[in-house]
Every structure is written in structure tokens, then in C-alpha cells.
Amino acid sequence: MNKQQKPKRSPLRPDYLVIVIIILLAIGMYFFFTEMMAPKVKQFDEFEFIAAIESGQIATVRSEYVGGDNFNLWEVTGTFTTGNAPEGVGSYVIILYGDRLNNIQDIIITYNELNPSTPITVSFVPHVSVDFWNIISTLLLIAAPIVLVVIMFRSMSSQSNKAQDFTKNRAKLSQGRKVKFSDIAGADEEKAEMAELIDFLKNPKKYADMGARVPKGVLLVGQPGTGKTLLAKAVAGEAQVPFFSISGSDFVELYVGVGASRVRDLFKVAKQSAPCIIFIDEIDAVGRQRGAGMGGGNDEREQTLNQLLVEMDGFSANLGIIIMAATNRPDVLDPALLRPGRFDRQITMQVPDQKSREEILKVHARSKKLDPTIKFSEVAMRIPGFTGADIENLLNEAALLAARESRTVISMQDIDEAADRVTMGPAKKSRKYSPNEKKMVAYHEAGHAVIGLKVNLASTVQKVTIVPRGRAGGYALYTPVEEKFNYAKSELLAMITSALGGRVAEEIMFDDVTTGAYDDFKRATKLARSMVTEYGMSDLGPIQYESDSGNVFLGRDYLKDKNFSDAVALEIDREVRAIITECYEHARKVINENKNLLDNIAKYLIAVETLTKTDIDEIAATGQLQWWDNREVEEDSKKSE
């Protein structure tokens, strides 16, 4: 398809019309200045010329034939003797008939006989000589307007072609290495769903004979980075068919009708390449519900969507064209786009679980030099919620860190640091705590660790650190005991208790509090409110008080439906406060019962600054951190020596 599109002219390439104008100006200026700078020529009549010869004013005479077959004309030119040239004049010229030239020659012969010391030099050119410069300049003056007219017509034609190119589709035909299913990990169910599409593209006759209709459109739904585009490429790579990819925003332009024209052109090209796959990324840019949003609809977008609907439902089911699209906002799509016969199948790309993350790590590690001792299962456990794109970025960051330190392989330490950089930002090593501030941050993070160790169903603390990153002075990395689709009320209460552990530790140990619990409160309040208004986990009963409004404003749901009274709103606030208070008191009770553990974890945090799960478990079991204590002993012994 790209071959049909004319190559675009470089922005640095000058316009042909400008070049022609510059050339014409240069020629005109050349002749103008040549004329201005050239010495003046005296034009004689015959009697003046004879008088000048007889008075000794003429030094040279050059006769050149300039007439044709019917006119015996001669051009006589020459120079004056010294001191006899008129002011500003360098030469003379006179045109004579042949018989009059003979008379002039006789006069010159007589003059030379009388003045042998200062004779007139005579030269004779019997044939016409060609003046190439005059011919070239004449031809240029004749040809320039013709060339100018031709270029103007070509420019007009080019503008017309540009207008046509403006309405052509911008889909790109995928070339180069084909993506295969082996390049995709952690999406076994999604790949199985796509298997029949691949079989249809390879063996369409088998389905046609059975009277089966393969889905015309497949909509891939999922969070950003879950592999929607990669899966679509893999389907095309496995089926060995052309793959046309385009973004939804490429259809929409300022001018009404352009998007619809591009849709028509896209399907025209696809029919010529069938069987093939058309992939529309971010289809919500063009497929958003018609008439929705502030200010009503958008004529250009709606016309484009209408044309897309017609094309999807208009071509024959046996053409072998499958439409695939991706979006992370299926709620904003027009219902007509999702009905059977168009996008009649939806495949949800889930955020990978621990097993899937491990498989994805193995795929992205193929091109990386990793330490053989690294266990992918441990890495996968430490990065809950990471998508495939996040994992690729994680390993790339780890590779950059290893290369920066001139190491030959990527270590587990590099991966840990990369995970921290991806989630929280780079460490702010230049920022220094005051001793009191460092102690408060250490006890805050130690409070989270104690709750994770002592509260049943609380998430496991994989790491705590007091190294500042981003806006956080320190943070604790949690991983759930088990990744689930559904969570019990007791598990949600444990999550809230874990979030409040840091503030409780500050209050108990310092009888003061800091702003460090800002994000903890945000997470705890959101969970508690969801328990009351969405999950029915309060005394208000199994009623959903808040839900998505379903109204799309500028592509995003800004509002929540309020289907309850102000009195109920007050009850909701009381229930949320009751949940937070209950969890806060529970955290206080646990911290008070485990003050020694809190002190030990905080003590080592102040010294080491970062503790792993292994370190925390050792401190909880023995009250010590052996590797650090041994290191302290060695340093003390060196100082004493």
C-alpha cells in the first residue's frame, strides 16, 4: 500500500516556481548591468563618417556582412584615434549598403596614401558569424515564459494531487520481522481465543463449507501495556497475512469528510490484499459514542464512525478481512460498533498474575545478560501489578544500571533498583535527613513492617527503605499473600490496618505525627469508602450507593451518580469513619504489643536504610541482623588496630 503513495517532498527542497523566478531575475540583471557598464557607441550617418575619416578621427574600420539574400547590408565598426573620441564614447558603428561601402573603402585608400604614417587599419569579415550569447539569451527569453506556464500547470496539478493524498488512508503495512505467539507470554487464554482466527485466515474454505461465519471484528480490551497491539501483530504473523495498522486519531481531521474518505480508502486497499488484518489502535478516538459529551457531537468524527460502521457491515464475510481494534476505554464506544456483525467478540487482556509475570520475564530476558543465579519466580513475586510493558521497561532499566557501572551481567541488585526507579523514581541521595527526621521516618516504615508481620491476612512486606524517592521520604513494598480476583472483608480491613501502621507508630513513639502518612490515608480512605458504597460491607446493607454515571464527558467519566439522600451521605461518612477508626485502633494494639520488634526494625533501618524481607524475618526471629552486626564488629576491630 505504501508503494501507491507518492513520496513527500522534503521541506528543505525549494519550490520550482521560485527557482524559475530567480533565474529570470538573474538574466535580466545581467543584461541590464552589461548595458549600463558598457562604453557608449557613436552612431554615424554616411556623411559624418566620411568627414571623420578625412579629418583623421578614425583609427580602425571593421566591415562585417549582416544582410540576407535580399539585402546587401554591412555593419562597419571601429575605434577612434587618440584624443578624437567624443566624451564617454569607446567605439562607433554605421550600417551601409554594399555600394556605399565600396565608396567608403575608396575614401580610406585615398586617406592612407596621403597619411602613410597614421593609416587606418581595415579588416573585412565576408561571412556572417554566429553570436552565441545573443542566440542563447533570445532562446531563454522565449523559453522562460513557456517553462513558467508549464510549471504553473504542474504546480496546480500537484496541489490537486496533494488534496487527493490528504484523503488517503494512513495505515502502515507491517514489514520486517513477523511477531509470533512465541514472543508473547502470560496470555495463554487470549492466544487460544485467537487460534480460530488464524485458522480461518489460513483455511477460509473449511469454514465457508460449514457455513460458519468467523467474527468480522475482534476488540482487544485492557489496561495500557497489557499487550493488545502485540497480540494483534502475532495473529498476523502466525497467519502469514498482511497487517495494516493505524491509529484511531489518524482518521479524524479538521475538515469534515476527510476521515470518512480515509476509511473508504483503507478498506479498498485491504480488499486488494485480502486475506489480511486491519488493526485500529486506540479506536475510542474515532468510535466514541455519537452525540455524547459536552456540547453535543462532532460532525467529522461522527461521519468517520458512520463510514466505519458501513464498511464493517458492508463487505462480504468471505473476503478474509478481519478487523482488530484495541482500547482501554470500552465504556465510551458506540453501541453500534459493538453489536454482532461488527466488533462481535471482545477479548480482555488482564494484568498478568505472578506465573504470567515469570513467563514474560523469561521472554524479555532473552536479549539480556542476566546473572545465572537470578530466580525469575522471586522477581515476579516482587513486582505485583506490573504489565508486560512495565516488565520490559524494568529489565531495560536494570540493563542500563549494569552498563552504567561497567558490569558484565545484570544482577538481582540491579533489578531491585530498577523496580524502585520504575515505581517510585530515582533515589535522592543528595537529600539528607536531620537525625530526628530520619528516626521518625524509620519508625514510620517499621510500623508498616510490624503490621505486615503480626496481622493475619495482611500483605507481606518485601522491603522497607528510608531512602527518599520521588515525593516519598521512604516506602514499604507490599505483596499480597495470594493474588486473587475477589477479596474478603477481613482482607480489606487488613489492608487498611497495614496502611495506618506507619502513622500509629509515629504517634506511639514520638507523641507527634508527620505528613508522611498522606498517601497511606488516601489508600485507606478509598478502600473504606468502596467497602461502604460499592461492596456493601457495612451496616448500611448490601446496597450500591455509588456507581459510574455512564455519561461520557470529554472522553472521561468525571461524575458519580448520587442516588442517595443527604441523610444517607452522612451515614456513609460515619461508616467510613468507623472502619478507619476500627483499623486504627487495631494497628495501635498490634504496635503496642510488639514495641521491641518495632524498635529493632527501626534501629536497623536507621543504620542500613533498606531492609529486605529476609532481613525483616531475621530481625523478627532473633532481634538481630547478623550480617550487619558482623560488619560492625569488623569495622570496630579495624579502628582499634
Curated annotation (Swiss-Prot):
It is an enzyme of class 3 (hydrolase). Keywords: ATP-binding, Cell membrane, Hydrolase, Membrane, Metal-binding, Metalloprotease, Nucleotide-binding, Protease, Transmembrane, Transmembrane helix, Zinc. It is a multi-pass membrane protein. The keyword Iron does not apply. Zn(2+) binds at residues 444, 448, 520. Its EC number is 3.4.24.-. One of its GO terms (cellular component) is plasma membrane. Residues 1-16, 153-641 are cytoplasmic. GO terms for molecular function: ATP binding; ATP hydrolysis activity; ATP-dependent peptidase activity; metalloendopeptidase activity; zinc ion binding. Its cofactor is Zn(2+). InterPro entries: AAA+_ATPase, AAA_lid_3, ATPase_AAA_core, ATPase_AAA_CS, FtsH, P-loop_NTPase, Peptidase_M41, Peptidase_M41-like. It comes from the Bacteria. It is found in: Cell membrane. PANTHER family: ATP-DEPENDENT ZINC METALLOPROTEASE YME1L1 (PTHR23076:SF97), METALLOPROTEASE M41 FTSH (PTHR23076). Acts as a processive, ATP-dependent zinc metallopeptidase for both cytoplasmic and membrane proteins. Plays a role in the quality control of integral membrane proteins. This is ATP-dependent zinc metalloprotease FtsH. It comes from Acholeplasma laidlawii (strain PG-8A).
